[in-house]
């Protein structure tokens, strides 16, 4: 694709194209990071990006930059093809969709698929090899079910969903529109519910539902448990990374982002736009307000207020955590000084 064609596409996008220079209008085959890009590749820079200095000697064919004078001057001096955009990262995402259009599997049901009784399959769907669909389940129109997926009984999958190889939807799972479930993820698995008795643990039946609202994406190997009663609900547009555990009865607001190895215990509540970085742990019935952020390895108990940024275990306001962190390495010397003061102080 010529850079000029890409510019025409970006003009229709939402990244805010402001200006561009075609230079020699290079033919672009793919995208790459600026430090590795070749003459037939596209890259981008954001304000404050650590790779900014690479622009002076990168071999990139064309680059997407923010409205930043120093970057524009470098691009012009080097004769690079470039575009100035309000949001270069978003533009790069839109460009990659043009450079790497995804192929859709052919519609139809593979002969090795096992389809239960009273299953409804919408128009234009693609069912891959060795898929199993349980009795009474419904798969919406234009959905893609890749090989090896197992869909239990009484599952509802809305329109235009994509279930990648070996994903599992257990009984009572409900998916809205345009959801993506990646390989080896399990939606609707039984919650960790047991009742202590004199004879050991008695299993609590997990009869509830798991609901993924529209546009939810679930990463590889992640699990979302169903509760004993009621539902576990993942808000629209929420993105879940690989290897995330979401316990029974958890409810998230819209547009949350949960990074790898996050663990959320049963009954926790997340507001809209919450961001949990890698390995964050959320305790049973904790409440996290809208647009709160937890940095990596934070341990959240109780309540986090809306818009707050927390760190550490137990999680405390980020600024306080940074101050505490700065003292950790000094603790041995401080303890030594304290012992000396104690010895030298008259009793």
UniProtKB/Swiss-Prot annotation:
Native organism: Prochlorococcus marinus (strain MIT 9313)
Source species taxonomy: Bacteria, Bacillati, Cyanobacteriota, Cyanophyceae, Synechococcales
Protein name: UDP-3-O-acylglucosamine N-acyltransferase
EC top class named in words: transferase
Coiled-coil portions: none
Family of this protein: Belongs to the transferase hexapeptide repeat family. LpxD subfamily.
Superkingdom as given in the UniProt entry: Bacteria
Active site: 248
GO biological process: lipid A biosynthetic process
EC number(s) given by UniProt: 2.3.1.191
Pathway: Bacterial outer membrane biogenesis; LPS lipid A biosynthesis
The protein's role, per its UniProt record: Catalyzes the N-acylation of UDP-3-O-acylglucosamine using 3-hydroxyacyl-ACP as the acyl donor. Is involved in the biosynthesis of lipid A, a phosphorylated glycolipid that anchors the lipopolysaccharide to the outer membrane of the cell.
Summary of subunit composition and partner proteins: Homotrimer.
GO molecular function terms noted in the UniProt entry: N-acyltransferase activity; structural constituent of carboxysome shell
GO cellular component, one term: carboxysome
This protein's record includes keyword Transferase: yes
Keyword Magnesium: no
């Amino acid at each position: 694709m010529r850079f000029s064609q890409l510019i025409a596409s970006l003009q229709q996008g939402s990244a805010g194209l402001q200006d561009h220079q075609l230079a020699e209008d290079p033919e672009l085959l793919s995208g790459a990071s600026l430090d590795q890009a070749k003459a037939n590749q596209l890259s981008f820079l954001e304000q404050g990006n650590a790779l900014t200095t690479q622009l002076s000697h990168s071999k990139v064919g064309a680059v997407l930059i923010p409205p930043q004078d120093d970057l524009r001057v470098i691009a012009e001096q080097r004769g690079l093809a470039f575009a100035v955009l309000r949001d270069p990262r978003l533009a790069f995402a839109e460009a990659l969709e043009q450079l790497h259009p995804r192929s859709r599997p052919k519609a139809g049901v593979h002969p090795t698929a096992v389809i239960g009784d009273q299953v409804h399959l919408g128009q234009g769907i693609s069912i891959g090899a060795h898929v199993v669909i349980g009795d009474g389940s419904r798969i919406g129109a234009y959905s893609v079910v890749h090989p090896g997926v197992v869909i239990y009984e009484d599952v509802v999958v809305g329109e235009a969903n994509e279930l990648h190889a070996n994903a599992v939807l257990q009984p009572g799972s409900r998916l809205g529109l345009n959801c993506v479930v990646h390989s080896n993820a399990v939606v609707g698995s039984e919650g960790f519910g047991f009742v202590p008795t004199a004879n050991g643990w008695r299993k609590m039946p997990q009869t509830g539902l798991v609901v993924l609202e529209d546009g939810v994406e679930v990463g590889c190997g992640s699990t979302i448990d169903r509760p004993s009663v009621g539902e576990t609900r993942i808000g629209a547009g929420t993105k879940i990374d690989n290897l995330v555990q979401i316990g029974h009865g958890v409810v998230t607001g819209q547009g949350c982002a949960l990074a790898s190895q996050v663990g959320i215990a049963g009954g926790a509540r997340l507001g809209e736009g919450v961001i949990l970085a890698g390995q964050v742990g959320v305790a049973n019935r904790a409440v996290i307000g809208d647009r709160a952020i937890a940095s990596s390895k934070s341990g959240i108990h109780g309540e986090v207020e809306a818009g707050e940024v927390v760190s550490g275990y137990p999680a405390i306001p980020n600024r306080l955590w940074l101050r505490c962190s700065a003292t950790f390495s000094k603790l041995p010397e401080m303890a030594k000084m304290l012992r000396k003061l104690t010895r030298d102080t008259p009793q």
